Amino acid sequence: MGSPIRAAIRLLVYLGWTFLLIPVQAVVLAAGFGLARRLPRFYHRVCCRLLGLNVVRTGEIAPRRPILFISNHTSYLDITVLASLIDVSFVAKAEIARWPLFGLLAKLQRSVFIERRASHSRRHRDEIGARLDRGDALVIFPEGTTSDGNRVMPFKSALFAVAERTARGEPLTIQPISIAYVRLDGMPIGREWRPYCAWYGAMELPGHLWRVLGLGHITVEVRFHPQLDIAEAATAAGLDWGSEPDRATVAAARKALAERCRSAIAHGVAESLAGGRDVAPVPPRASGAAA
């Protein structure tokens, strides 16, 4: 499935465009210009056109900054899709920083790289918090890995620890986002074809990327859900969220927030995959979010 000729042409044009923009972004980033936050969106918008990605957005993007966007994660394509819509940096696994080319691009987009070991969690939380204190917009993929695109996996609530922070005396704004790859050349992408877009499990990146480059035009639906915060999630869960909640309440509120985000995102993905038809809301998991 797909055209090797199309794949080769797209790869060459993509590399040409990328190597043209890399030195520009490196200079504005080193100089501390505000353009360093905005240039990646222009770069990724062009990349979407080059790669045949038709991005369809629904919902309003929360205007407040700082903000933490929470999204499901299906493929490396998610980065280009989201960054074509909003000026953001990503919270990514540390090993991505060592990937050829993609690691460099992640650094130029001011990504925050985190280790999986729990011993590093406080340092990572402080680093993310410092970025938010500077008014940044960050994206977290709390599934911790990519999925097959047919479902949203449990969220790791530990990644929501930064949501306990306040911004200008108010709880940090959180906005869930759903991403779904729904059509190929105008035809619905069924469950059996979704692995052509989703990258997960033991799939090799070079081979999968080559197949993606050879495909036609992929329609990606991105849904921005209503914003919320940890205080709102705590209140909805029946927790006593006062001015100084205890550790147990904070932990429970973090899990409640993770599940509210996951429920909204999973429902959005399900509706997109169903062609926009209404589907039953996805209830929070009874056992709570994964730690």
Where are each of the predicted segments found?
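N-terminal membrane-anchoring alpha-helices
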Residues: 1-56, 284-291
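Catalytic core of membrane glycerolipid acyltransferases/transacylases, capturing the structured
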Residues: 18-26, 30-34, 49-50, 65-119, ...
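Short amphipathic alpha-helix with an adjacent loop that forms part of the alpha/beta core around
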Residues: 59-62, 127-133
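Residue-level preference for the first positions of well-ordered beta-strands
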Residues: 66-68, 137-141, 173
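A cross-family acyltransferase "interaction/gating" segment
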Residues: 102-103, 117, 149-244
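Soluble extracytoplasmic domains of inner/organellar membrane proteins
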Residues: 128-129, 136-138, 142-155
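Cytosolic-facing loops and C-terminal tails of multi-pass membrane proteins
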Residues: 236-247, 255, 260, 266-291
